[in-house]
C-alpha cells in the first residue's frame, strides 16, 4: 500500500544468543509470522518460510513442522523449507548441551564468509547433495545408524572447514571433544545417540 507502519518488537529466548545455537532462527520465524499476521497477509507456508529467511537463513526451517528440508532453487533464487515428514513420523529427541553461554568470538555470518578460504570447502559443498540425500533417506526410512553416519560426517566436515579457514576458527569448547568421546563410548555400549 506504500504506507509506512512501525512496530515495537520485544523478543526473549531461553537459549544463549551468539553461542552457535541458531537463536536467531526462532526469533525471525516468530517475527515473520507475527508481522504477516498483523498485516493481514495470508501467506502460504512456503511464502512464510521464504520471508523468515530474510532475517536469518536458519529461520526458514523454523516455519514448517516435523522433519524439515531447506531448499534453494538455483533458477528462481527461491529459498525456503518444507516438511519431509510429520513430527510424529519418528520419535527422536534432541539434547542440547550448553558448554558455554559466552558469545562466539567470531559470529556465524563472518564464519560463513571465511569458509571460502578453506581448501576443504569446495569438497564439502560438492558433497552436500549426496549428504542431503543420505539424510533424507535415513529420516524417511527411520534408519538411525545411517542418520548417525551422515550427521556426524556433516558436523566433522563443517568443523574441518572452519579449522582450515584463514583465519582459522575453533568453535569447539574444551568440553566438546570430551562430549564427542562420551557419545562414541555410549554408541559402543549400544545407546542410540549421535552428535552434531
Task: Locate each region found by the language model.
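Gly/Ser-rich oxyanion-binding loop with an adjacent helix/lid
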Residues: 4-91
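C-terminal nucleotide
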Residues: 86-196
